[in-house]
């Protein structure tokens, strides 16, 4: 099992799909990496040599923000929105949908379990 960017890649999958197991790398960027390094998309992870795996890891480290660093950056971006106190930051702080979705009937995932308010 190849280990790239702190993630164990599944042995039997094709490399282009296995790289998507790394947080921050999708199918498009995985194909760009393989093209830049010169490895076939059809190759399986267990068929990779040590040199190929290290060249992939080197390319990812040079060009992409992945795993913990990317998660940290996303959290910092959200925190800065909340500190600024703009609309998106307030929505994050309140735990409501940020991108303009309606909240009258839906948004249960974001709002949590229904809190019934009794009336007299």
From Swiss-Prot:
InterPro entries in UniProt: Rbsml_uS13_C (IPR027437), Ribosomal_uS13 (IPR001892), Ribosomal_uS13-like_H2TH (IPR010979), Ribosomal_uS13_bac-type (IPR019980), Ribosomal_uS13_CS (IPR018269)
GO BP term (any one): translation
Gene Ontology CC annotations of this record: cytosol; small ribosomal subunit
Gene3D superfamilies: 1.10.8.50, 30s ribosomal protein s13, domain 2
Basic residues composition bias: residue spans: 107-120
Keyword line: Ribonucleoprotein, Ribosomal protein, RNA-binding, rRNA-binding, tRNA-binding
Domain of life: Bacteria
Region described as Disordered: 93-120
Molecular function terms, GO-annotated: rRNA binding; structural constituent of ribosome; tRNA binding
Pfam families listed in its UniProt record: Ribosomal_S13
PANTHER family the record matches: 30S RIBOSOMAL PROTEIN S13/40S RIBOSOMAL PROTEIN S18, SMALL RIBOSOMAL SUBUNIT PROTEIN US13M
Family (UniProt): Belongs to the universal ribosomal protein uS13 family.
Function: Located at the top of the head of the 30S subunit, it contacts several helices of the 16S rRNA. In the 70S ribosome it contacts the 23S rRNA (bridge B1a) and protein L5 of the 50S subunit (bridge B1b), connecting the 2 subunits; these bridges are implicated in subunit movement. Contacts the tRNAs in the A and P-sites.
Name of this chain's protein: Small ribosomal subunit protein uS13
Gene: rpsM
């Amino acid at each position: 099992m190849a280990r790239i960017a702190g993630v164990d890649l599944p042995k039997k999958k094709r490399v282009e799909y296995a790289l998507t197991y790394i947080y921050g790398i999708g199918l498009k960027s995985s194909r760009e990496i393989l093209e830049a390094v010169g490895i076939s998309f059809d190759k399986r992870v267990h068929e990779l040599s040590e040199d190929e795996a290290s060249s992939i890891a080197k390319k990812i480290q040079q060009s992409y923000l992945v795993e913990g660093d990317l998660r940290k950056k996303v959290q910092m971006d959200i925190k800065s929105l909340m500190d600024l106190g703009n609309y998106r930051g307030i929505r994050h702080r309140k735990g409501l949908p940020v991108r303009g979705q309606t909240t009258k009937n839906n948004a249960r995932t974001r709002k949590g379990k229904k809190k019934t308010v009794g009336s007299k």
